[in-house]
């Protein structure tokens, strides 16, 4: 049997179950990787690796288009989106497509168009992926030197980084254009229960935008997740887009400084580990955003946040009992604290009962009833609107609690409905994926550093027990 290792190897060698599966330049003997090691076989075949990446993009866009059309086909306009297990249509509605006052869906045609556009795009990407995987040149360096690269070429790598940053910057400006010029976006804080509006005055003050980055991530601070108005959201996209574009130009025009050349490992697997770390961070941030934030993820589409559902319950029963003659300002609960209203540690009037721990919740249906010192007793008596009652009653019964078998609500609730909040699905999935990507980062970073240090040489195959065994095939 041919020896499949050398002392200078920096990758593990796997043994094929069936030695007959072989493709030139992609078999185990020439690459050191078995078929199931995927793109590792293509590390030095830039043309084939391009095919794998383009095909992967095609799969992603195909999922988006197919799932989009699936949600459109199943959508019932009479029910809220969050009752229907939808995760893509809420994003489109948040961008202001097909939605009217109060978050009511008035037109599903834009959603259909979005799905079809993604399907068509996926066909183009799929064709490109298959072409480059099977027909196009194995390596790009000879025929198309602009697209060719060597992993160790630090200058070329930072040029590629710069191109990616410019593309990301352009992407960050797309929601800005939508909000400013193309019909606006959905604002859950618009008076009367939310509406689509153009953002005419985005926040460009750097102290306001970068102030979010300097806030604590804990408690009432909430880092960037605490953003509560669309002016700051769109202004943040302007800043991020600009930074990405200028940073991209910088990386294209410059070579890495000496400290950067020393600090980083310059290999394909190292770049993979850096990317996985970034994606892991994105996943954790997205998890917190969709769980806590009801401005970027409006409750009309995603369902209430946990604190919002809890406060909605207190509000709903305050409204009911006030109608029945209860004095909500002075009634005491079983603990001697206020039954409906009490004071927060800093003196504001807040809802009493178990929901006191969520006293700092801000929600569009509740804010009109506040005064300078928290909830305003006279507003609670005279100013509650029917839409506020309807919305809080709806949110009260749709808390983002739920088990895998889709029995939603509090575990002890006898009238539980078949409901799990999209907030639960999206935050849980992004947390789990963020964690797995972090583990992948550690794995690939460790291997890349070991390879760079020259001490990952693999198992010495001369003493490998499997060599004395009968081949499986």
From Swiss-Prot:
Residues bearing the modification Phosphothreonine: 15
Proregion positions: 1-14
Annotated GO biological processes are:
photosynthetic electron transport in photosystem II
- N-acetylthreonine modifications at: 15
- Gene3D superfamilies, per this entry? photosystem ii from thermosynechococcus elongatus
Entry GO MF terms: chlorophyll binding; electron transporter, transferring electrons within the cyclic electron transport pathway of photosynthesis activity; metal ion binding
This protein's source sits in the domain of life called Eukaryota
Q: Which residues bind [CaMn4O5] cluster?
A: 367
The portions of this protein that span the membrane are 69-93, 134-155, 178-200, 255-275, 291-312, 447-471
Q: How is the cofactor bound?
A: Binds multiple chlorophylls and provides some of the ligands for the Ca-4Mn-5O cluster of the oxygen-evolving complex. It may also provide a ligand for a Cl- that is required for oxygen evolution. PSII binds additional chlorophylls, carotenoids and specific lipids.
Q: Which UniProt keywords apply?
A: Acetylation, Chlorophyll, Chloroplast, Chromophore, Manganese, Membrane, Metal-binding, Phosphoprotein, Photosynthesis, Photosystem II, Plastid, Thylakoid, Transmembrane, Transmembrane helix
Q: Name one GO cellular component term.
A: photosystem II
Q: Which Pfam families match?
A: PSII
Topology within the bilayer:
Multi-pass membrane protein
| Compartment(s) where it occurs, according to its Swiss-Prot or TrEMBL record | Plastid, Chloroplast thylakoid membrane
Quaternary structure and partners: PSII is composed of 1 copy each of membrane proteins PsbA, PsbB, PsbC, PsbD, PsbE, PsbF, PsbH, PsbI, PsbJ, PsbK, PsbL, PsbM, PsbT, PsbX, PsbY, PsbZ, Psb30/Ycf12, at least 3 peripheral proteins of the oxygen-evolving complex and a large number of cofactors. It forms dimeric complexes.
Q: Family assignment?
A: Belongs to the PsbB/PsbC family. PsbC subfamily.
Stored HAMAP family: PSII_PsbC_CP43
Q: What does this protein do?
A: One of the components of the core complex of photosystem II (PSII). It binds chlorophyll and helps catalyze the primary light-induced photochemical processes of PSII. PSII is a light-driven water:plastoquinone oxidoreductase, using light energy to abstract electrons from H(2)O, generating O(2) and a proton gradient subsequently used for ATP formation.
Q: What is this protein called?
A: Photosystem II CP43 reaction center protein
Q: Which organism is it from?
A: Pinus koraiensis (Korean pine)
